[in-house]
Structures are given as C-alpha cells and as structure tokens.
C-alpha cells in the first residue's frame, strides 16, 4: 500500500451518491445542480461545514474527488487485525476538541495517551538515567528557547546553532519533522508557538477516521467529482467538474494547500495576492506511517508505549515507533519531513523492510516475532493532497488567518491550514468548517 490515488470522474448519479452506504445518503438519481452552498471536499472541514449549514436549513451539496469520504482522516479496517488510522490518529486538546463529544455520543472507545512510557534503546540496551534526563532537559530548554523568540520569528533549527548536543538535536527534530512535518530549517517558531500544546491527546480504538466518517450521515455527497474550476459570478458561484456544473450562492473550498498551490483548480477571478502569499507560506509538510503487523506481541512493552532509538538516533532520519496500540500486534512507525517523504516515495515493501530493520536494531532483535503484514502511507504522492498537512514557513506570520479570509464574500477557504490553535489537526479542520458555515449563514440571512 505505497500510495492512495483517487482520480475517478463519474456523473452525479445514484451510484456516486450512495457509495457511502451506511451513511444513509439521499437516494437521488441525480444530485442537485443549484444549492445554497457547495462544499469542495468531504474531509472533516467540509463535512463540518455541510452539517452545520444543513442544520440551519440551507441546501448543501458536497463534491468529493475521491471514491471515499474523510480526506486525510482515513481508517483502514481491512488490512490488519485491528483498525489503523492511515492519516490523523489523535484527538488533540481532547478536553475541548469538538470531535470528542461526537465520538463519545456514538460509543467510540477513547484512550488518553499522554502518559505512555517512552523507551530509548540501542541494540536492546536501555538509555541510562543520565541519558534520559538529558533528553528531558533538552526538550524543556527548547520550549523555553521558543518562548524567547521575538516578533521577527526564527527557524526552529536556529535554536540549535553552533555546537548542538545530540539531545538538543533530537528535541529539534521531534518538534519539526516528527510534529510539524517540515524541515527544522524552514519551520516557523512563532507558528508552532501559536498552535499551543496539543495535550491532552487521545486515541480512538475504532479509528479517528471512523469518527469523521460518521459526520457524513444525512448529507448529500457526490463522490468521484474532481472540481476543475470555480467561477464567481456576482450573486453566485459556479463549480465545474468533468460531469456537470453546480451553481450555489456560496462555496467552501477545503482542499489542501498542496492542491491549491498546484493550480489543479482554476479560479475565476484568480486568487489574489493575499491568498497567493498565504499559500507560499503554507507548503505541505510530510508525515507518513509505516505499519508493521507482527505475529505476536513484543515483550517488555505496554500497549501504546513509544520506542525511540537512543544513541543511534539519526536526526535526519528520525523515527518514532508506536507499540501495540490497544493491545493489537501492530507497530506503527512515524517519519516526517524529508525522511517521511523519502519513505513515501520508496516502494511500500522497501519502506517496510527499512523500518523493520531499524526496529530490529533498536530492540536487538524481535524476540522471534515475524512480519505478518505491512503498509506504508504516501500522502505526498496522492494528487488529491500532495502532503500530510500544511506547516508555516519562517516569517509566514498570519498566513493561516489570511488564507481563511482570502476568498471574499461568496468564496470561503477552510481546512487544517486555516485553523488557529489546532492548526494541522483534525479538530482544527472541523472548527474551520464551522467558521465558514457561520459566515455563509450570516450572508444568506442578508439575501
């Protein structure tokens, strides 16, 4: 499973509208071509906007290029013995995340994950207490250094200038590549600081992608509809796919900045200087997973523990191993930045074997365990995303807010790239969809 491509284009038909089955979509032979609001993208931002607008009594149609819903929230329920989130996994700031009450109301199993143990190992030998203390101290010093950056901004890597000890290098790479998905040399300190802490962080046993899927119930969603152009026509917006044109009073665009930057969608009039500047400051980062299913559990670890390389840690090829989430015989390796992109571009089996070798070296062997199944995500190679999520470049300033308001009176941008404190997250994308819906509702009330 090296990559995931969805580029079909079929009519707005009963087949495309009912492709979600369990989501109880309207059994229409053809979707409406004139609505109050058309939503481009059936990820969490688009679904949130559509749900809210429909709840307020507005007619809504969601156009999705893929043959599935959820966007970068995608739970694989078939490849392994347990569900695996191939995209976003954690409910960040779970105590105030808007998806938390939705998940609870539907009976999803949630697990607080902030207290998971961390193991730093080389050939099965655990890091000494002194080494662990150095790692913890480096993380704390980095946080303090980030707090001290002034309004001029700085690249995260600049906080490790000159002679930088291995613990500080680790902290930098954890915060940049393994968190933001961008190179430390290009990642904005002020952008990371504005996002704040993600804690508390919770996992969803059935998959966060399943929670997002549940948002689609009752919505009119046309799958396989790649939008080619969006034209603002005074009192309306025309959204064209290969199959048809939908006319709406308002349009919400939730595609990634990677898609916008690729000009896969033609805008008339074109995007203005503010939007283009924001897109330049918000490239797609890379965060990919290599999923390894073993034929039994690794001994000496509790479900949900983390494993990292100790002295053998490679700053330019950082990996984090999530061990046996919810007691499944799974190891989910995570890589970001250029190394995440490298794994995404490699053949899936090659990526699996490379990561398995790193895990084996870290543990000093697998205790007789064998690889039963594997997969590797490749969000950068998917033309519907071009990456995992948007990180803020150094000096990018208020690019997220600028993109959020760049559309104008009838065109609205939403998605994780436009979020504030929960930027780069599923919860932030959801909130951005609600923001766009509120703006549309206010506009429709005036017409």
Place the predicted regions along the sequence by residue.
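N-terminal secretory signal peptides
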Residues: 1-12
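FAD-dinucleotide binding site
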Residues: 4-6, 18-447
């Amino acid at each position: 499973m090296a990559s995931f491509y969805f580029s079909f284009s079929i009519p707005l038909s009963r087949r495309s509208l009912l492709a979600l089955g369990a989501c109880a979509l309207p059994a229409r032979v053809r979707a409406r071509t004139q609505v109050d609001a058309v939503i481009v993208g059936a990820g969490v931002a688009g679904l949130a906007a559509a749900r809210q607008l429909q709840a307020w009594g507005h007619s809504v149609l969601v156009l999705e290029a893929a043959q599935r819903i959820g966007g970068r929230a995608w739970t694989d329920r078939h490849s392994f013995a347990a569900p695996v989130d191939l995209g976003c996994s954690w409910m960040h700031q779970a105590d105030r995340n808007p998806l938390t009450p939705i998940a609870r109301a539907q009976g999803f199993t949630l697990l607080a994950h902030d207290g998971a143990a961390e193991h730093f190992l080389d050939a099965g030998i655990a890091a000494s207490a002194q080494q662990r203390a150095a790692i913890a101290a480096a993380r704390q010093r980095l946080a303090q250094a980030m707090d001290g950056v002034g309004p001029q901004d700085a690249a995260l890597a600049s906080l490790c200038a000159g002679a930088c000890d291995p613990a500080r290098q680790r902290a930098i790479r954890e915060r940049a590549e393994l968190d933001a998905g961008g190179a430390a040399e290009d990642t904005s300190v002020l952008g990371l600081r504005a996002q704040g802490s993600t804690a508390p962080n919770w996992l969803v046993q059935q998959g966060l992608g399943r929670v997002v899927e549940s948002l689609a119930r009752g919505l009119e969603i046309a799958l396989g509809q790649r939008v080619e152009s969006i034209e603002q026509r005074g009192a309306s917006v025309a959204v064209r796919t290969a199959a048809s044109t939908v006319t709406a009073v308002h349009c919400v665009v939730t595609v990634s900045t990677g898609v916008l930057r690729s000009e896969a969608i033609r805008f008339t009039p074109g995007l203005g200087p503010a939007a283009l500047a924001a897109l330049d400051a918000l490239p797609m980062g890379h965060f990919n997973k290599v999923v390894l299913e073993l034929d039994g559990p690794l001994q000496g670890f509790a479900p949900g523990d983390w494993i990292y390389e100790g002295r053998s840690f490679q700053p330019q090829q950082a990996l984090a191993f999530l061990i046996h989430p919810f007691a499944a015989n799974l190891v989910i390796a995570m890589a970001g930045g250029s190394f995440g992109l490298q794994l995404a571009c490699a053949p899936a089996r090659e990526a699996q074997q490379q990561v398995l070798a790193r895990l084996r070296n870290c543990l000093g062997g697998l205790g007789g365990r064998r690889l039963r199944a594997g997969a590797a995500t490749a969000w950068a190679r998917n033309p519907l995303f071009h990456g995992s999520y948007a990180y803020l470049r150094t000096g990018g300033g208020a690019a997220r807010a600028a993109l959020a308001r760049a559309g104008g009176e009838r065109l609205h941008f939403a998605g994780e790239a436009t979020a504030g404190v929960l930027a780069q997250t599923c919860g932030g994308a959801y909130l951005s969809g609600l923001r766009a819906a509120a703006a549309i509702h206010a506009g429709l009330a005036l017409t």
